[in-house]
């Protein structure tokens, strides 16, 4: 069996136990009901290396890190604007957030402190971010003129400091490039195959 988490309009996070044989009927009973948020929950994200640890982000601009095994909220912290995307790094020691204020934030999930922040993309439509396996950060968003755009950033990986295409330590604000794509109106989805090296 394995567990799946769902975000909900009713301000809760629900954890479901999925049998090895798969879902064969409509599931109506969750195994854990996590209650903290005051507005709808839009993001749930399992920790990449710690068992039973789940992150949730709601429309109340709050983030909660849960121990799903006990149903306990381990840590809560607020962000200044609505969270549009969240992504753990590979060992779970950092979380990236993109917010409605156009900023990308690198947060320490042990204390909720914002370690670094920068403008992700200048457009008013939302941006998304993902950690790549090599430690770089890939973002998608829009220009001021609503042209789709992507960016590659180096948020503090000393292994790349001698490479011409990468910038020095702790500079999320320095993009490695922001090629404009086109004028399409739809959001770009982050597509990343984690087990392949970029």
Question: Predicted segments — roles?
Answer:
Residues 33-198:
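WD40 beta-propeller repeat blades
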Residues 1-42, 50, 54:
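Eukaryotic helix-linker segments that join adjacent hydrophobic helices
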